[in-house]
């Protein structure tokens, strides 16, 4: 089990230090998730609680990764993103697949198998699997918009566009194509900001769907 305490498989611009918080800039940027989560929780309501808890969970797991800088904490970070995309998939697929219990079990098994595959193959396996789940989510949203089960497609496109912009900065950071001495402006940090904003915008999007007259 020693490999779980080894160094992560992805090296970003901010080098890990021998400190209580290994990557202080990246760790600090996770505050964006905490702020978004608290704002959502203060709004009240079912969707605000759901997305507020999601934001807090993603931010906390990501902070643990940046603070401890181990392969195990990298898995925590990836787990947070898998949980996020899993919830989004459930919200969409529950409008397509009527048996919600089977859907929930199927998604849970799929996410668990994804995490196992990440542990086995390491490298960028987590990012590849997460990318595949994102593609499935995009396809489900396009289907729901085209079949009029969802509306406000422009609002969803803006949220996804912001996520995509952050992901591009993340890629630049992971490949060391864009690095700055001020770590709060490095790609991984920017990815945190855009993800926190995306979670809030997706909350607004799904709240609009819940308030729509039933078709």
Segments (PLM) and residue ranges:
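Multi-pass alpha-helical transmembrane bundles in non-GPCR membrane proteins
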Residues: 1-215
């Amino acid at each position: 089990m020693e490999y779980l305490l080894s160094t992560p498989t992805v090296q970003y611009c901010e080098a890990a230090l021998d400190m209580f918080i290994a990557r202080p800039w990246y760790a600090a940027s996770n505050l964006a998730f905490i702020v978004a989560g608290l704002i959502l929780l203060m709004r009240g309501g079912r969707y605000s609680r759901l997305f507020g808890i999601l934001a807090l969970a993603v931010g906390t797991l990501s902070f643990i990764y940046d603070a401890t800088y181990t392969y195990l904490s990298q898995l925590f970070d990836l787990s947070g993103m898998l949980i996020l995309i899993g919830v989004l998939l459930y919200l969409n697929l529950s409008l397509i697949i009527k048996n919600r219990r089977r859907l929930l079990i199927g998604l849970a098994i799929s996410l668990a198998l994804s995490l196992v595959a990440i542990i086995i193959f390491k490298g960028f396996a987590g990012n590849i699997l997460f990318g595949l789940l994102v593609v499935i989510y995009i396809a489900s949203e396009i289907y729901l918009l085209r079949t009029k089960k969802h509306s406000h497609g422009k609002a969803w496109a803006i949220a996804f566009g912001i996520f995509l912009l952050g992901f591009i900065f993340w890629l630049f950071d992971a490949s060391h194509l864009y690095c700055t001495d001020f770590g709060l402006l490095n790609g991984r940090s920017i990815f945190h900001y855009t993800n926190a904003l995306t979670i809030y915008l997706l909350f607004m999007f799904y709240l609009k769907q819940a308030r729509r007259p039933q078709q």
